[in-house]
Amino acid sequence: MEPDFWHSKWNAEQIGFHLNEVNPLLIKYWPALDLAPNSQVFVPLCGKSLDLCYLAELGHKVVGCELNQTAVEQFFAENSLPHLMTPAKESISELNRFDASDITLYQGDLFSLTPEELSGVDAFYDRAALIAWPESMRLAYVEKLIELLPPKSMGLLVTLDYPQEALKGPPFAVSNDWVMANMADYFELELLSSEDVLNENPRFVNKQVPWLTESVYQLKRRG
């Protein structure tokens, strides 16, 4: 999606994708990665997710990237986190940087993020990034993720799948076949769960979407 689309959603407070709790799937499946507490975790398209705080509470150093500055500012304000903001013009980065004790957020275009800015990353968590891209842009995101993540890094990926013609995304439908066809060359993939969650999502029910499958994958970057 174009940046203006996401900025307009935040400006209008149309953020149905935001959860007001830690994602239960993160709580359930993150321990399977068996990471050291001080591991550094990358969270792309993080919004103001409470998952960032949860990961930090586990002892991880969390690095997120979010396009919209309002989302970043709300995250720190709503969680009462003192932070330091470094504008892009005052650093070598093309993104604004917000630093709290265990959480760093880069604000700006994900595609401007560099591997150097993620040096030290051991893991990643994608709940709402892959499904935020229409199919025409999705592969470019995967290629960027591959560029940013070092070999052997572990990750958790959450996807949604449904008949795309039944509803205009985002979130967009991402099938298991798409994940395997486009990511298996770069990641070892293990499907941890796949469940129908239609009844838990009124928007999809109201649009008469016939089914909605939420899947969780464990990934390991090849190399």
UniProtKB/Swiss-Prot annotation:
Top-level taxonomic group: Bacteria
Keyword entries, A-Z: Cytoplasm, Methyltransferase, S-adenosyl-L-methionine, Transferase
UniProt-listed Enzyme Commission number(s): 2.1.1.67
Cytoplasm among keywords: yes
A GO cellular component entry from the record: cytoplasm
Binding, S-adenosyl-L-methionine: W10, L45, E66, R127
First-level EC class: transferase
Catalytic activity: S-adenosyl-L-methionine + a thiopurine = S-adenosyl-L-homocysteine + a thiopurine S-methylether
A GO molecular-function annotation: thiopurine S-methyltransferase activity
PROSITE patterns referenced in this protein's UniProt entry, alphabetically: SAM_MT_TPMT
Family (UniProt): Belongs to the class I-like SAM-binding methyltransferase superfamily. TPMT family.
Protein name: Thiopurine S-methyltransferase
Encoding gene per record: tpm
